[in-house]
């Protein structure tokens, strides 16, 4: 099974289950991936409501407790990238949540994940590597920070970051994903055109993405910076504690 088949199968399973919104998808990922077919919407919701739950995908971190680190670059190369995530509690009027455990993971510039590979899902074998994965605990301001490289993309998905949030006791609060702004002057477009990245030919935009096609307003990040100086992502995730 390849990644596109996995996402499609997972989406159907979520619709059938209904009770598992984390698996619900409503668009096929074999739609036109060469152009944006809908209007680009990079708006960010400010509502005090739980962030959408999403699938953890086929490449979740296997032992996140062993990857407590802020610098997740390892041996990967790419445009410098920092990730700042704030976690808020909707049951406390969206006050910043201290002590939440945050796991993140994303693909490298070529669209590959560590800890997996050698299969139809991902041909390149990185089963023994752990790059671009990390865990941090939110501070008094509800924040965690990571140093990484700007992620690439792979067939069937827009650029994204996976996030799993737990309470201080290690109980799961939310599995979600972070979306990236799109457009000609977006970081996604600028990085894709830079040295070492693969461009946007065949790219799946948010409007056609299996996960994001139902809307990205509470999953959309803000990304600033330049290719030469690096980019910085900020994002707020809202959970129920």
Can you describe what each PLM-predicted range is?
Residues 212-225:
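Low-complexity, intrinsically disordered Gly/Pro/Thr-rich segments
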Residues 151-154, 222-228:
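Exposed beta-sheet edge/beta-hairpin loop segments within beta-rich domains
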Residues 8-11, 15, 227-233:
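C-terminal region/CTD detector
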Residues 24-25:
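C-terminal motif of bacterial Sec signal peptides marking the signal peptidase cleavage site
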Residues 1-14, 29-30:
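N-terminal secretory signal peptides and thylakoid transit peptides that target proteins
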Residues 35-215, 234, 238-241:
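Beta-strand-dominated extracellular/periplasmic modules and repeats
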